[in-house]
């Protein structure tokens, strides 16, 4: 594209559009990545949309760039939507700038991508990776022959005995078989007193004997889990339950290579290539302390020079490219533990951790009663006060809504006071909520809203282009009901439609940064106008807290003033086994009650007797709202239990776990 920078000629409509796109790309790189573009030519360029994170491979991008001259270096940071290129001369980089800006290419998934280039003073990338495997981790390449691999794969019959749930299950896009003992996913344990008939398959015997003889394992396994994964799916990060299995856990990768992510509790992440026919051995720290998981995607970032060499993926961004995943089957062997775990990692050991307060029962009836008392009734009674503290929409939710095509039909499931219903006037939005009083507030604001349950939305299947569910699903009291809520969202979407979901996070400190919920927020001089419009300083502070918090301003405390003993204290609500969470502190239980001190407006509010507390014409009664706060990876795991959806994006946003789903 030939662009007139001098302004002598009048820019065409397409040129104006291009300049806007290029400027936006420059702004996004500066804001989110700290990459500063310069206005004068240099040898180095940053290429927005040309990264591994966009599905652009090194080979494809290099072929495009070399048409402008010899490339001295092409740097492609892992999982990032941009790349750096360094040409030998400034003239060559100028040629790339003028000829490739706005160029359309097709990524490895067949989607159109437009490149936007800007000059940078220096192409650089801060290496944050670890260059060594986690202690106790071993990857052995070519541990079996191709003939042995074929025998193992052919021994798995996925069509027989599908009705027998004792050893075969379908986890949507992941098929699972158990031998020796069934692994119970709801409790992450095995029933040690109920072995499955038949033991381990005979085809595994010679391989296990070989591993024992060569010293890769010390104990012969008695439990086997076989998983089959389609490209694009993975496993949430987890640690195999300490009390269920012994130290050694080994896994064979068959059919396709994969990159597995290992993460230390302090935040260090290591990506490890598991080649086809390789053996992964986890012992000691890597087994007990580090989480392991597989990110759901169709391509892995690998080293270009050694694509399928086992071991750590180095952080050399001059040698990274994409590798397409295939159908992978894993054989994971474990030894069931018979004695209590006495490992050195008590902070993550289910046996050694300090006992937590009892949680709720899984009974559907009791779950419904809990939700009725500590969610439905409470929000109906605090609706007016709650609405007065909810004005400011969250930027990334606004971004999602504004990116939708004009005329899209969008459902806000659990819309509250409707603060997102009017964000984009070009959309047809409808809201629903379980609270009649909150729906009435929506109608007063001229929004379309109705009363219904999020598990049974009276809207035709496949009729929505998009849905949002903001701070709703964490109010359901069982894992099954939370998955049902996700399934209902998926039912509403047309094929290709997207859903944005926010839930409150257990991790209120993430990547060494405390959420605004823990930090609180001082009122600055610039906030006077909003403060003056609020009924109190406390209400202003509430509006600055994370989306899922809905915090009671009257109970806000400085987390630094809470002692360790007070943090663990389990205050109880009458007739409830759930602990009351202390606001502005970290969570120590996933199932909690969060207080709300109701402020009444004598001229408007009716004197409502709170159903969540005994006693009562208290002018400032306390209500307790039920929450299930989600751990890292839990929301993605719940989404994977839903059929016909794929996870487009997952991220952390100020104390909330968030995903974008797409109906397939």
UniProtKB/Swiss-Prot annotation:
Enzyme kind, highest EC tier: transferase
CDD domains listed in its UniProt record: AdoMet_MTases, RRM_ALKBH8
Stretches assigned to the Fe2OG dioxygenase domain: 220-337
Matching PROSITE patterns: FE2OG_OXY (PS51471), RRM (PS50102)
Keyword hit for Membrane: no
SUPFAM superfamilies to which the protein is assigned, alphabetical: Clavaminate synthase-like, RNA-binding domain, RBD, S-adenosyl-L-methionine-dependent methyltransferases
Domain RRM positions: 45-120
Domain topic, free-text comment: The Fe2OG dioxygenase domain does not have demethylase activity with methylated nucleotides.
Effect listed in the UniProt record for changing residue 238 to A: Abolishes hydroxylation of 5-methylcarboxymethyl uridine
Assigned protein family: Belongs to the alkB family.
InterPro entries registered for this protein in UniProt: AlkB-like, AlkB-like_sf, AlkB_hom8_N, AlkB_tRNA_MeTrf/Diox, ALKBH8_RRM, Methyltransf_11, Nucleotide-bd_a/b_plait_sf, Oxoglu/Fe-dep_dioxygenase_dom
GO MF terms, alphabetically ordered: 2-oxoglutarate-dependent dioxygenase activity; iron ion binding; S-adenosylmethionine-dependent methyltransferase activity; tRNA (5-carboxymethyluridine(34)-5-O)-methyltransferase activity; tRNA (uridine) methyltransferase activity; tRNA binding; zinc ion binding
Organism: Mus musculus
Protein's recorded name: tRNA (carboxymethyluridine(34)-5-O)-methyltransferase ALKBH8
Quaternary data: Interacts with TRMT112.
EC number(s) on file: 2.1.1.229
Co-factor(s): Fe(2+)
Subcellular location: Cytoplasm; Nucleus
Binding-site residues, Fe cation: 238, 240, 292
